[in-house]
């Protein structure tokens, strides 16, 4: 069982490493999104550089990476505690942030982390998504909405009584905020781009 978990974790990392924004940009738009906007491989920069259609596709793909990776033990009928689903999900987040297929320069882990939560705790995903969308509607900042959504997920997770989930969501929230430190500076300086499509 230990070997199987290790293999599934490695597979989850590979799945997380799929650079959706980079590949869609290069294949369909002849653009390397690392050379435009924030230079980030995530969904937000895909929206900014490639447009709403491509950005939406990248977002869905990045969420699915987290969801599929989290469900790997289920797909392979591995008889383990559900907490191990979070292990494979965590490896997908690592893969997305430090992708094997993109020089270990990845996204900020928001969408893929959301996919992990969607697979493990769907109601928590919905609650965090509502907070994200409300914040986005008010502020027009994707970065700020992502951070507040992550913090909301952490707060709500405390009411679920699953300490393994709480620990993972706490790590996700801290990591998301850390990955957005440049965005925080730009928000303070009034230089952070606002979305125009919502």
Swiss-Prot record:
Q: Which UniProt keywords apply?
A: Cell membrane, Lipid biosynthesis, Lipid metabolism, Membrane, Phospholipid biosynthesis, Phospholipid metabolism, Transferase, Transmembrane, Transmembrane helix
Single GO biological process annotation from the record: phospholipid biosynthetic process
Tell me the membrane topology, using the record's own terms. Multi-pass membrane protein
Pathway terms, separated by semicolons: Lipid metabolism; phospholipid metabolism
Which superkingdom does the taxonomy of this entry point to? Bacteria
| Claim: Cytoplasm is one of the keywords in the record | no
Q: Which InterPro entries match?
A: G3P_acylTferase_PlsY
Work out whether the entry's keyword set contains Membrane: yes
- Catalytic activity reported: an acyl phosphate + sn-glycerol 3-phosphate = a 1-acyl-sn-glycero-3-phosphate + phosphate
Q: Which HAMAP family match?
A: PlsY
Subunit comment for this entry?
Probably interacts with PlsX.
Protein family membership: Belongs to the PlsY family.
Q: What is this protein called?
A: Glycerol-3-phosphate acyltransferase
Q: Which organism is it from?
A: Listeria innocua serovar 6a (strain ATCC BAA-680 / CLIP 11262)
């Amino acid at each position: 069982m230990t070997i199987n978990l290790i293999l599934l974790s490695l597979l989850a990392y590979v799945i997380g490493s799929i650079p959706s924004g980079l590949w869609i940009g290069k294949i369909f738009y002849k653009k390397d999104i690392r050379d435009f906007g924030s230079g980030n491989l995530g969904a937000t920069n895909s929206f900014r550089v490639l447009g709403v259609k491509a950005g939406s596709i990248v977002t869905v793909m990045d969420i699915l990476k987290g969801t599929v990776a989290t469900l790997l033990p289920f797909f392979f009928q591995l008889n383990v505690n559900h907490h191990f689903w979070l292990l494979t999900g965590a490896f997908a987040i690592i893969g997305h942030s430090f992708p094997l297929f993109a020089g270990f320069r990845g996204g900020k882990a928001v969408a893929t982390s959301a996919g992990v939560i969607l697979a493990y705790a769907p109601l928590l995903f919905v609650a965090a998504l509502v907070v994200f969308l409300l914040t986005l509607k008010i502020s027009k900042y994707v970065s700020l909405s992502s951070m507040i959504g992550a913090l909301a997920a952490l707060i709500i997770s405390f009411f679920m009584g699953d300490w393994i989930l709480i620990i993972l969501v706490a790590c996700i929230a801290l990591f998301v905020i850390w990955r957005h430190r440049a965005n925080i500076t730009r928000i303070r300086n009034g230089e952070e781009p606002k979305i125009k499509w919502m």
